[in-house]
Amino acid sequence: DTRYPATLLNGVALRILAEREVSRGRAAILKAYYTKLAESTGHEHPDIPEEVLQVSLNPDATNVPYLLGRLFSVLEAVQAAANPGINATIRDKYFSGASATPAAVFPVLVNLAQKHLKKLNAANRGLSIAYEKQMTELLSKLGTEYPAHLNLPQQGSFQLGYYFQTQARYQKKEEK
């Protein structure tokens, strides 16, 4: 029942930031790290929110880094829907900054998303409304201010929130 070394979390987080991709394997390593840490500390650790220990998207989550990751995924989906076939997405340009310094990046991304929603509304009003509803729900849970910085464990929560929200979107597409 020993913890995984912090270098494991650091290494995975750096790979995610460098490649801007949270793969299934990386998400599994993040979850394993947090699960072991929770077991060794008796779930009484400030950097282990309950959402991180879940096996799928937790729509009732209140953990700010997790919610920010979910919001980033929705913003990425809005951009992709408004600009099909785009070469560089917000993930390519903003993922690292959004997961480390949300206060500097998210106001820009939300502003961009409003423009994307306007464009999408002209092409597909129903999809535009659905994305706007998701954004509004997440933004209301986040409150009025974004955190200036996220530490490494919080970045892991962000990355898992992003991963689970993205996977939930793909599952919905497969069910249709």
Whereabouts are the PLM-identified features?
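Intrinsic-disorder/low-complexity detector
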Residues: 1-176
